[in-house]
UniProtKB/Swiss-Prot annotation:
This is 1-deoxy-D-xylulose-5-phosphate synthase. The lineage of its organism: Bacteria, Pseudomonadati, Pseudomonadota, Alphaproteobacteria, Caulobacterales. The gene is dxs. Binds 1 Mg(2+) ion per subunit. Mg(2+) binds at residues 149, 178. Its EC number is 2.2.1.7. GO terms for biological process: 1-deoxy-D-xylulose 5-phosphate biosynthetic process; glyceraldehyde-3-phosphate metabolic process; terpenoid biosynthetic process; thiamine biosynthetic process. InterPro entries: Dxylulose-5-P_synthase, THDP-binding, Transketo_C/PFOR_II, Transketolase-like_Pyr-bd, Transketolase_C, Transketolase_CS.
Length: 638
């Protein structure tokens, strides 16, 4: 049962916290933590990160006048406590559900979410944009970016920090170090020093000292500068950030409410240069099962609040992710040139399994997709067989490198694109909807999509065998169909699809895991007296043009089905048919794609039904192409 929350019950907006004492803020933080745990136990989601920033969230909304003052959360999966405090408590148990709250910050959801998030390292750049707009308008509000140490492995964060000093003198960056990867706080002395260097008296003395130093002879002046930097770096660890033009404060204990409130008040009106506050937090703080878990319960399904035991579904067939990893391990056992690269997602992509088998051939480059792609290009250029395992949505971050460093040079980098299609609870920011279009546009690219886990095994083998150009294969989140996978699947013939069912009236050409729904749609058509051919294209590029032309000759209509946006597989098929004159004889065609909107989170099956990509939707597409507006198909040729 949820603990009593007397203070939280009085909060309708962050303004209600601004008269609270520090003691009351501590109690409020405890209540927000309990509320967060209770909510996520019902919805599932990202738990550990949010628990780690409860005190910081309360302190930020207490010290700053949000939403006038802008707070931008990097990634956003730590923002559940923020949502509880900003008028969304009554809907917090709809997190990541259909029609409910997003699992990330979202502009359309609240004025307290000034900038949407989900991909890493965007916060400082966005904050600088807000700062420049504020300065241009002559306004005086604060702008705060909260970024984790994990996101600081992404180059975009440093690009923004490098530009900060030339953009504005008034920006606050809070570095949420929840992995103790930069520097731990050193007890009470650390908190004292952080408060000291953020205070006005220290800054005045330091400014006076700099003025005096500037009047000294050059050799003495340079020595004095270096000594000051060295001494300050020894005490605070902030020399690197100072070199970027920031005033560094920290590290401080991110769970010490007294220190947080004091330091944030000190830096609130700092306008000499951008300031970075280094806050050290503990992921999963305040919930024993999270504190004791290896991953700090970063992402969870529904769980029991008392024990922390997650209510995981009964084990089913292996996931597509696991099948990919297992197949790659098989090939690596007989081919020592195979290398695997991930951008901070080893468990999400299955490369944690590959890494256990072949640690010396596994590279986690951090949140650095651009580097991952060009690093793989370098490996390929020197004879290795690199596999970049990456979520489709994150490959977007490295697309220029795919074009410039891989495709133009025709280097045999293999892209394993996980989370293709719709992903459910994580919504539009994590959906893999565009890769067919942007990868299929590249000359020389071999682009495949697996219909099931056996096909995925064949595609891994195919990618291993392709050594004269780049290749990519896509597969969805979730479990396979439970099919038996060969010991070592054979490579596919490049650019050749397969006919799964022969028919006469309409040809349904599927790419990817919609094949099962296409077969169901064929059954529905058969029940209406219509005979359907079902084909698995396998390749979006190069297309099996011979198969497509044959289907065009022998059928009244062709329906293409894909788990992607317009401009992908269906567009490629239309282009091929038009080029070969197959549309000149009255062929009827429909391309079934995801709708031209960013679909909000829901269960994947419901999302595909909304998109018209389930069996009923495919049936409707086929009947429309055939000019049938009712359920009767009497008289149609069978």
């Amino acid at each position: 049962m949820l603990a009593l929350t007397p203070l939280l019950d009085t909060i309708s907006s962050p303004a209600d916290t601004r008269g609270f004492s520090v003691a009351e803020l501590k109690q409020l933080a405890s209540e927000v933590r309990a509320e967060t745990i209770d909510a996520v136990s019902v919805t599932g989601g990202h738990l550990g990160a949010g628990l780690g920033v409860v005190e910081l969230t309360v302190a930020l909304h207490h010290v700053f006048e949000t939403p006038k003052d802008i707070v931008i959360w990097d990634v956003g999966h730590q923002a559940y406590p923020h949502k509880i405090l900003t008028g969304r408590r009554d809907r917090i148990k709809t997190l990541r559900q259909g029609g409910g709250l997003s699992g990330f910050t979202k502009r359309a959801e609240s004025v307290y979410d000034p900038f949407g998030a989900a991909h890493a390292a965007t916060s400082i750049s966005a904050a600088l944009g807000f700062c420049a707009a504020r300065d241009a308008k002559g306004e005086n509000n604060s702008v705060i970016a909260v970024i984790g140490d994990g996101s600081m492995s992404a180059g975009m964060a440093y690009e923004a920090m490098n530009a900060a000093v030339d953009t504005t003198k008034r920006l606050i960056v809070i570095l949420n170090d929840n992995d103790m990867s930069i520097a731990p706080p050193v007890g009470g002395m650390s908190a004292y020093l952080a408060n000291l260097v953020s205070g006005g008296a220290y800054r005045k003395v330091r400014k006076l000292g700099k003025t005096v130093v500037e009047k000294l002879p050059t050799p003495i002046r340079d020595a004095a500068r270096k000594a000051e930097e060295y001494a300050r770096g020894m005490v605070t660890g902030g020399t690197f950030f100072e070199e970027l033009g920031f005033h560094y404060v920290g590290p401080i204990d991110g769970h010490d409410m007294d220190a947080l409130v004091s330091v944030l008040n000190n830096v609130k009106h700092f306008d000499e240069k951008p300031v970075l506050v280094h806050v050290v937090t503990q992921k999963g703080k305040g919930y024993a099962p999270a504190e004791g878990a290896a991953d700090k319960l970063h992402a969870v399904v529904k769980f029991d609040v008392v024990t922390g035991q997650q209510h995981k579904a009964a084990a089913g067939p292996p996931s597509y992710t696991k099948v990919f990893a297992q197949e790659l391990i098989k090939h690596a056992a007989v081919d020592d040139k195979i290398m695997a690269i991930t951008a901070a997602m080893p468990s999400g992509t299955g490369l944690d399994l590959f890494g256990k088998a072949y640690p010396e051939r596994t590279f986690d480059v951090g949140i650095a997709e651009q580097h991952a792609v060009t690093f793989a290009a370098g490996l390929a250029a020197d004879g290795m067989k690199p596999f970049v395992a990456i979520y489709s949505t994150f490959l977007q971050r490295g697309y220029d490198q795919v074009v410039h460093d891989v495709a133009i040079q025709r280097l045999p980098v293999r892209f394993a694109m996980d989370r293709a299609g719709l992903v459910g609870a994580d919504g539009p920011t994590h959906a893999g909807t565009f890769d067919l279009g942007f990868m299929g546009a590249l000359p020389g690219m071999v682009l495949m999509a697996a219909a099931d886990e056996v096909e995925l095994a064949h595609m891994v083998s195919t990618a291993v065998a392709i050594d004269d150009r780049p290749s990519a294969f896509r597969y969805p989140r979730g479990e396979g169909l439970g099919l038996t996978i060969p010991d070592l699947a054979a490579p596919l013939e490049i650019g050749k699809g397969r006919i799964v069912r022969e028919g006469t009236s309409v040809a349904i050409v599927s790419l990817g895991t919609r094949l099962a729904e296409c077969l169901k749609a064929a059954d529905l058509l058969a029940a209406r007296g219509l005979s359907a051919t079902v084909a698995d294209a396998r390749f979006a590029k190069p297309l099996d043009v011979d198969m497509l032309l044959r289907l065009a000759r022998e059928h009244e209509a062709i329906i293409t089905v894909e788990e992607g946006a317009m401009g992908g597989f269906g567009a490629f098929v239309l282009q091929a048919l038009a080029t070969h004159g197959a549309l000149d004889r009255g062929l009827k065609i429909r391309t079934l794609v995801l709708p031209d909107v960013f679909q909000d989170q829901d269960k994947p099956d419901l999302m595909y039904a909304q998109a018209g990509l389930d069996a009923e939707g495919i049936l409707r597409g086929a009947l429309s192409a055939l000019g049938i507006d009712n359920i009767s198909a009497a008289g149609r040729r069978a």
